[in-house]
Amino acid sequence: MTAIAVGELWRYPVKSMGGTRVAAVRIDRRGVHADRLWAVRDLDNDITATARRVPALLRCTAEYRTEPGPAAGPGNVPEVLITFPDGVRRCSTDPDIDEHLSELAGRRMRLTPLPEESDTSVHRLRWRQLLAAYAPSAVRKDFGLADSDKLIDTSIFSLREVATLARFSTPPGTFVDLSPVHLLSTTSLASLSTDGTGFD
């Protein structure tokens, strides 16, 4: 059997932004501790923004101002620093942070901390959003599928997961789409970078 070594660990303080390389992580029921405790809300569409729908977010990186303590989590979110594509850094407490995010995205945005798990207000989908999100064309776009490709097989998801996905943009208590932890091999990352684009 070939030995496997961990090459890098990354934590992503803000959903859909670049993250921070860290020396160690703690895995809990939500995934990596203090991962994706912030998200950007698309105010015009009343939904949590994703990199698929607002790719400009990927041009930013985020890090915590200080290392999150063990109590960090839903409803107890530490300050975050965001580095914008022009190199300007803004803190989550800066009064103009939302203006900068809105300018970057080209529409009204708001940086939002993860609320308590019982508060589903930032997760709940409206009917029009639900219908739009699960239209075959939207699913194909989200998963990078061509019109001629088969749609994904949803039988891999439990009934509870499907019900959660049908009601919420992200599961309550987290800003992850579905999988709280991703394990990638260096070979997989290298194959994604064949054109010279770097991935973290």
State the predicted function of each range.
Residues 1-199:
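Electropositive, beta-rich accessory/interaction domains or terminal extensions
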